[in-house]
Amino acid sequence: MSSEDLQDHHEIGNEVIKKKGVYTKKKCQDCFFLILFLLFWAGMIVVAAFGVKNGKPDRIVKGTDQYGNICGVNNIEQGILNETQARDTTNEPYVYFIYYPDLIGINYRVICIEECPNSTYTDLNDPNQLICDYGTVPATNQISPNGTCMGKIKSKLIFNRCIPDVTNTSVVLNSIVDEIYQFVNNQLTSDLSVEILTDLTNSWRYLIYGALIAMGLGLTWIFLLRFFAGFITWLTVFAAYACLGLLTAQVYFQWQDSKDAYENTIPSQRLVMQEKNILALKVIFIILCVVCGIFALILLALFSRIRIAIRIIKECSRAIGIMPSIFFFPIFIFLLLCGFTVYWVYIGVYLATAGSPTYDDQYRFTGYEADSKLQKIQIYHFFGYLWTFAFILALNQTTIAGAISSWYWVQDKKDTPFFPVWSSFFRVIRYHLGSIALGSLILAIVQFIRWVLRFLEKKFKGKEAYLARFIVRCLNCIFGCFERFIKFLDKNAYIMVSIYGYSFCQGAKRGFQLVLTNILRVAAVNLVSSFLMFLGRVFITAATVGISLYLLKEHENLSFYIIPVILIGFIAFAISTGFMSVYDMSIDTMLLCFCEDCERNDGSPERPYYMSKSLRKFVDGKGRSKCC
């Protein structure tokens, strides 16, 4: 920083102190990026309108007949199919397979019916035991050779489809059942992304339950940490590890149970989704075992330093105790994140089913094909999620930083501004949204590049493109490190922006200089406190996922229930991040304020320090009078 910039910076700092911790001569910064963000969201609204207009989630949820009619709706009014194919199936909500033998084996027709048959035919000469295609009347004493009429088979309802439920039947009938199971497997795996989104839609209540559980655990953790910092910190360490161990054991036993059930099923009647669930549980179990081992090593390495981190947490608790509304701010952030995620998934389901229907050579529905225009729209929608999610988290970080800094920069802490959290929030809304938009945009771009690299790595998998796969993995590793650096830079920039009203680039520059100058002094605090906050996230996430896994494993309408559980895990981690960010951001803000305090003041009566004695003693290590 040049001497002229440093002089301007000191003048701004003195203004902060005069105004009881709040710099009042702020102005809007980075306005261009705020306008860009608003224009991008105008595009998101257009994308949502396109998805709602063209998407048909019922195609997957309710199923279709071989003509493309959605079961359980009036397809004539929807006007998707031509007049000769469209049919009103309002009173026919279930998919049924009319099977019949032909020259190449077993063939089938697909229709919508009122209810699944509850018994298997015994006499094909009885018209009441036959089921026919649309417009065909069962003929007495005969069945149709082309499959328009065949005998009923007792069926059970799976994913809105009538699947034969037969035992001790003839070889021919078992062959028919095998064919239908194969058809269901093909249909359910024809577009796995659509099926996953459908499962998320069917389990929306459990997603909300999981979010509420995570929110309750987060509020409890923060409230107790305020009054019992030392006890809760140690409890968090052991509880997080215990929950992780219990979750590992639960996943192991559920993996074994699922594998046993799969092996006891007739091979021809095994669903692909069962196998995918077993594989997913096995992979998750192995990952959890590795994570448990890593956590054990980290705990051994940081055991003595955890006591030091407790002191800084207590100092943050002093600041938070003066502003109790800070406990409720994560709820506001949670509502924003939850509402936006629900909106994004909802529109995503519509976009995933907005493609053109595809059919086989007998004009039976097989899936959907997205053209290049739809693919670009889906990419736009995905990037919007990354940018907006980062924007909301940045809003939380900047608000917390502004509230804590307004407490730090007053000699008498009773002079802290009234309602510091919400005052800081309104300052952010008024002056700093452009800076937040820029910081979150940079982070979203890096995250998007990493997702593209993951896609390329998956595309090269199984092919003899070893060099390309190696390059992609290296790039993914590099951008992973770069993403962590951007998050670090963003956080420091938001702190300086909230204190002095800098633009994003100015704040990032000044924040990085402060950390670089005091790197040895603050590194240990940052490392230990960040690890403790991460343990809090693990505790909340592991407990939430464990409860959700128990609730969802018995859900009948989910074909791949691990996906909702994983999403609940992400939601719980995001919610816990919002809660932990209160202490995490408080610690980082205090450290940067401390460095600023050291640079500007020397402890003399004319230029006294603003830090508390306990904080100064902790950071200085030996309680020396010299600050830096």
Swiss-Prot record:
Question: What is this entry's stated membrane topology?
Answer: Multi-pass membrane protein
Q: Which residues are glycosylated?
A: 82, 118, 146, 168
Please state the protein's primary subcellular location.
membrane
What reaction does this enzyme carry out catalytically?
choline(out) + n H(+)(in) = choline(in) + n H(+)(out); ethanolamine(out) + n H(+)(in) = ethanolamine(in) + n H(+)(out)
A single MF term (Gene Ontology): antiporter activity
Give the protein's function: Choline/H+ antiporter, mainly in mitochodria. Also acts as a low-affinity ethanolamine/H+ antiporter, regulating the supply of extracellular ethanolamine (Etn) for the CDP-Etn pathway, redistribute intracellular Etn and balance the CDP-Cho and CDP-Etn arms of the Kennedy pathway.
* Gene label: slc44a2
Protein name (database record)? Choline transporter-like protein 2
Spans traversing the lipid bilayer: 32-52, 205-225, 227-247, 283-303, 320-340, 382-402, 433-453, 531-551, 560-580
GO terms under cellular component: membrane; mitochondrial outer membrane; plasma membrane
Question: Domain of life here?
Answer: Eukaryota
State the similarity comment: Belongs to the CTL (choline transporter-like) family.
Species source reads Dictyostelium discoideum (Social amoeba)
